[in-house]
Amino acid sequence: MTAPLLILAYGVIRLTDPDHGPGPVWTTGHLALTAAMLLFVPVFARLWALARQDAGRAGRLSAGTATLLGLAGTLAVTVQACIDLQVGFRAADRPAMERLFEQVQSHPGVVPAVYGVGPLLFYVGLVWILVQLSARRRVGFWSPLAAVAGTAVAAAGGLDLMPLSAALFCASLAPLTRRRPAGGPSGRAGEAPVRLTAVRW
């Protein structure tokens, strides 16, 4: 899938610049991250469609809540990436970037919304909806486990372990890479349960 692949690309690109200062590497990496977040919108839409398929009222409510949380987190990370891009364009060196970041983060609500709780919602929404899909056997049981592992790696290792975290998210989202058959057990075209059979990112 393109979205997690771009996160992987961001993580690898970031590791090539130990100074993390303004320049082509910073810009390229954050453009990849921005594109990844934008592409996660249809990913969450696909997960939502799978989770609510043949689900009861509670299942649909759960899927909708998880999707909204995931999209809110996606928005927060996108805003953060755009801020990073803008700072990179304006600053001449890393100290100048730090001063600009301080100015941005001095505004009330920016830190929790864009750098704190906001981005965490991406992980919460993704794990939540994958757990729901696994409970209904739409994906393998280890799909949400891979997402949890990816989240744990990101939390423990920070951005330096982003490539490993992205690879785990690749595994968790692999079911979405399968082409749906024309019909399935539900009797409706294109709505066969998706099983985890291969890892592709």
What function would you assign to each model-found segment?
Residues 1-201:
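Hydrophobic, aromatic-enriched alpha-helical segments typical of multi-pass transmembrane helices
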